[in-house]
Regions:
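Helicase motor core with emphasis on the C-terminal RecA-like subdomain
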Residues: 1-179
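Cys/His-rich short segments
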Residues: 176-194
Length: 194
């Protein structure tokens, strides 16, 4: 059904249809319960020392705190979020693309149009708002086909935080946000898959 809608909207004939799997065998995907998130992050960074990675955080404040924490400990990291001046955001993004900086700590504002093949890890410091967003964000890892690690740190407090923001919505927007949250929670709590 989705493919039919896309074909109709873009006016493609069925002869132009290519179907591929979302499965990326080079991505090691892990979900871990949050305990000491800063230490869990450091542990991951030590495994991928001097390699490129993205750390996604829920809020600008968390991005600033985590990037400052990492920089103070000698990691090559920069923040990226919509609250930064355009020039700073662009400078941090370009430094990451050029490998002048190894780690970008960002909100979901980061990533659209970025094609950096050598991203070795993606950490979700907080639960994403949707499974679709999560797939898109982890899809930035290992585009060169080499092994990469995707770590989602999960806790019920993340769910409560997202529920708080969902409660501010109304109607269909609220219903869709609840569906998205339920899907990512099911994924994070699925002990057979994760």
């Amino acid at each position: 059904r989705v493919r039919q809608d896309i074909r109709a909207t873009l006016k493609f004939s069925t002869t132009n249809e290519f179907v591929a799997s979302f499965n990326r065998e080079n991505l090691y995907i892990e979900v871990a319960r949050k305990s000491d998130t800063f230490q869990q992050t450091i542990d991951m960074l030590e495994r991928y020392k001097d390699q490129s990675g993205i750390i996604y955080c829920f809020s600008r404040k968390q991005v600033d705190e985590l990037s400052s924490y990492l920089i103070a400990r000698g990691y090559s990291a920069r923040p990226y979020h919509a609250g930064l001046e355009d020039i700073d955001r662009k400078k941090n993004q370009e430094a990451f693309i050029r490998d002048d900086v190894q780690i970008i700590v960002a909100t979901i504002a980061f990533g659209m149009g970025i094609n950096k093949p050598n991203v070795r890890f993606v950490i979700h410091f907080d639960l994403p708002k949707s499974i679709e967003g999560y797939y898109q964000e982890i899809g930035r890892a290992g585009r060169d086909g080499l092994s990469s690690h995707c770590l989602l740190l999960y806790s019920y407090s993340d769910v409560a935080k997202l529920n708080y923001f969902i409660d501010q919505k109304e109607g269909n927007e609220k219903r869709v946000a609840i569906q998205h949250l339920n899907a990512i929670v099911r994924y994070a709590e699925d002990e057979l898959t994760c």
